[in-house]
């Protein structure tokens, strides 16, 4: 039995001695300057390593995230603002045009005098002061024109649409209701559009072409070639 | 020796504390830039709203100008009361779009047609072409026509067989009321402007003036 007791005793003794050895080694390390410096440098390097990646992460995130979100939103806002601004400007222009009620000329060559309207290679003038047919023709001639005639469908459609609801003298006339209609240059009318009424002087009404007595005072329409054509000639 | 060990441990804990302190400063830097962006965004949104409202206002205004004043055709429903034999009805006011003058209501046509068609159009409104009864009425009518560079048929035509101008109610034109400029030939009808009365062909296209007499019971 005592022999067994002896056998049991050695393990605790061995463990005690081991622990004592460990304590001695730690003391030695702490006492030496080299190991302490090494530990200090390690701690510094550790802190720098931990700091650097953190700062890198933050720096990386800011440029990555902010431009993706904010500038995109701003750009969208800018685009929308520009579009709306353009729309507002366009509407303002439309308003000013409507208010002044200026009718833009249909000049193809922009070679008609002021207040005349260009259609194809002709210029048309709407005389808003009423006068009889003969005086209307005289007033047209004073401007190097004749009472209006139409040579094309385009001119005819223009005259029909532009005159509004008033009656306008134009270039057709005849000697009597039994004679054929003629233009002011005495060329015969081709009757492409029938003329109402039984009189001798043609005018445009909102019902098409009509005829009346020449002494009646009405507005009138003049026509002449545009200067571009005359220049070419 | 043991106490020195403990101090070392405390130092190791402090270093992460320093690291944590650095985080808030970085986050505050990040907040400053977004703040400016937020301000810009707010201004942008305000501008957007302002532009949108302006756009809406202008659109409404332009549409308002574009819409031409509707020319409502003057349609008169037959007044059943008027047709009743009791005759209780009394028209004391002019219908819509008609111009009152003493005991008459006048209206100007929107279209041009020969005289006979004008006569029919008036009758469909339970009216007749205008009959001018005195000089005062002539002045009133011509005053209405100021600013209109148009001509209007009235209820006066030339009767070839009698060699005289007659109103459509059968009465003869009195020379002192109005003077007619132009030919006195067959198929002549009177046209009025704001200054003169002309004789023109009845088959010519012109506007016309209708009159409706107010009835008092």
From Swiss-Prot, chain A:
Sugar attachment sites: 132
SMART domains the record matches: CLECT
GO cellular component labels: cell surface; endoplasmic reticulum; external side of plasma membrane
PROSITE patterns from the UniProt entry: C_TYPE_LECTIN_2
GO molecular function, one term: natural killer cell lectin-like receptor binding
Residue spans crossing the bilayer: 77-97
Topological category with respect to the lipid bilayer: Single-pass type II membrane protein
Bias kind Polar residues: ranges: 16-29
Side of membrane Extracellular, spans: 98-233
Function description: Lectin-type cell surface receptor.
Annotated protein name in UniProt: C-type lectin domain family 2 member D5
Organism: Rattus norvegicus (Rat)
Lineage, broadest ranks: Eukaryota, Metazoa, Chordata, Craniata, Vertebrata
UniProtKB/Swiss-Prot annotation, chain B:
Motif LCK-binding motif: chain residues: 31-34
Coiled-coil segments on the chain, per record: none
GO molecular function, one term: carbohydrate binding
Gene3D superfamilies in the record: Mannose-Binding Protein A, subunit A
Transmembrane residue ranges: 46-66
Tissue spec: Expressed in natural killer cells and a subset of T-cells.
Superkingdom field: Eukaryota
Keywords from the UniProt entry: Disulfide bond, Lectin, Membrane, Signal-anchor, Transmembrane, Transmembrane helix
Domain C-type lectin, first and last residues per copy: 101-211
GO BP: regulation of natural killer cell mediated cytotoxicity
Subcellular compartments: Membrane
Leader sequence segment: none
Disulfide bonds: 122-210, 189-202
Function: Binds CLEC2I/Clr-g leading to activation of natural killer cells or stimulation of IL-2 production and proliferation of T-cells in response to antigen stimulation. May contribute to the formation of the immunological synapse between T-cells and antigen-presenting dendritic cells.
Protein name, as recorded: Killer cell lectin-like receptor subfamily B member 1F
Organism encoding this protein: Rattus norvegicus
